[in-house]
């Protein structure tokens, strides 16, 4: 994955998309192979080294905001900075600035239970951005949102990608989210089987598919293509 690139990971449920995301973010150790982030082999790092690399490089956005229920929006956003040793005063000031940027300045004191789904996701995005990550890993980031809020979140992603150079790797079933990416990778049964360009139709992946040959020279054919070939 290149710096500043936006990639969508598409494919049927159960194909391993969320597991892949956890492995790439260092939340799960792969059963085989290795994962490199910012030029470092994550599978060979100590626990502390992995935490430090993750804090400096990557942030996560999940379908549910995963906000701490007893902390207000400001404190939720400031929390990652506190973990990095930033003073509470500076962390809160930076959190206020980030929430203001995301249109949440009027809700900084609200607990998660007082926020709508879209507001919670904006707070989660602010928390993900507060450490100025080079890469954002997002697992179905708009899956729990209504169409209007989904479009607002997607517009925010586009702004961050185009103007701030933030890289995105997004697991999605959404046609709109996949269309935001520079390219899409199709995952089936734990293997990347094809690559798709911009504007992929996740409901018809056979339309513009380019098959992938792995490092062993093997091509894994998608099931629908096997049927068409008589396999």
What are these regions (language model features)?
Residues 33-41:
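Conserved ABC transporter NBD signature motif
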Residues 25:
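Helix-to-loop junction immediately C-terminal to a conserved catalytic motif
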